[in-house]
């Protein structure tokens, strides 16, 4: 009997949703950064076994939106909990239950599918904090399963996957077994570049960064030639991104190239230009051009 179903991962920004998904898949398919709100789109990722197929939906964190891009992200996260077979509510033990957590849990109360509490980052906490957190969340919601994990190290992740399999109904193979994501290669490439920019810039430039793939061609010898526009909101941000004597932009390019070669499994040449598009996060037309469709 073949089993298949859809699992969505929800939680506040920066609790480790993308890290968990990347560990399960063994591929960097979702952007990972130490900054919150780095995932901006729902990404369907497919895990296929001999007798099962799990389609994961990795979502943006749910937060109070401050601009049209934020509205898009929150609506994407809410929409992803409809018509799924299982919801994983991800959080970590070192933070109190906040308004964001309660907002998410309240939105899940009318769901017919089971909801798991997945307590991430237990390796960074203490047994006392973990126990207190489990008690707090259990008093807020009737979770079917509670699974403490350390996604970055893979601790208890296999146990979580085994539990997920038990929730799958009998069903078809929705995607070919060699397909691991429903997003095009260009999208993953843009997310890799955006992640590296966020990591290199740290707190120097806020989340007003987008990536537009201008060209992506593969030559006869297999080498990819990629040209990218890195879009920011202010002229001052452009200067920071380029850096003194172009050193910051060079660093972003080098770290991006390394990760792109791992993902594409071939040599990559990448060129990055920095462009200013003022208030692009509130520009509906530009958001659409960059792939953020209005919900």
Swiss-Prot record:
| Region listing for G3, in residue ranges | 58-61
Task: Name where it mostly resides.
Answer: cytoplasm
Provide the GO biological process annotations: ribosomal small subunit assembly
Molecular-function GO terms, alphabetical: GTP binding; GTPase activity; ribosomal small subunit binding; small ribosomal subunit rRNA binding
| Residues covered by the Era-type G domain | 3-170
Q: Give the start-end ranges of region G2.
A: 37-41
Q: Which family does it belong to?
A: Belongs to the TRAFAC class TrmE-Era-EngA-EngB-Septin-like GTPase superfamily. Era GTPase family.
UniProt name for this protein: GTPase Era
Which species does the entry assign this protein to? Clostridium botulinum (strain Eklund 17B / Type B)
Q: Its encoding gene is what?
A: era
């Amino acid at each position: 009997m073949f089993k298949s179903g859809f699992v969505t991962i929800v939680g506040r920004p920066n609790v480790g949703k993308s890290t968990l998904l990347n560990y399960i898949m063994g591929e960097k398919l979702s952007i990972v950064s130490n900054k919150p709100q780095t995932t901006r789109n729902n990404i369907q990722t497919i895990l296929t076994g001999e007798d099962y197929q799990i389609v994961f939906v990795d979502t943006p964190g749910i937060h109070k939106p401050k601009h049209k891009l934020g509205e898009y992200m929150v609506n994407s996260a809410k929409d992803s909990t409809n018509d799924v077979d299982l919801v994983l509510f991800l959080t970590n033990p070192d933070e109190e239950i906040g308004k964001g957590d309660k907002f998410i849990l309240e939105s899940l109360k009318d769901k017919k599918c089971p909801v798991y509490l997945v307590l991430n980052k237990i390796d960074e906490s203490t047994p006392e904090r973990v126990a207190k957190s489990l008690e707090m969340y259990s008093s807020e919601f009737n979770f079917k399963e509670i699974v403490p994990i350390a996604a970055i190290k893979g601790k208890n992740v296999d146990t979580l996957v085994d539990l997920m399999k038990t929730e799958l109904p009998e069903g078809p193979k929705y995607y070919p077994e060699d397909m691991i994501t429903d997003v095009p290669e260009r999208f993953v490439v843009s997310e890799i570049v955006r992640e590296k920019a966020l990591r290199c810039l740290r707190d120097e430039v806020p989340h007003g960064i987008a990536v537009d793939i201008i060209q992506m061609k593969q030559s006869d010898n297999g080498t990819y030639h990629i040209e990218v526009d890195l879009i920011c909101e202010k002229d001052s941000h452009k200067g920071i991104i380029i850096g003194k004597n172009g050193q910051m932009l060079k660093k972003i390019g080098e770290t991006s190239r390394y990760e792109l070669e791992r993902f594409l499994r071939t040599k990559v040449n990448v060129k990055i230009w920095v462009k200013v598009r003022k208030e692009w996060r509130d520009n509906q037309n530009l958001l659409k051009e960059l792939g953020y469709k209005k919900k």
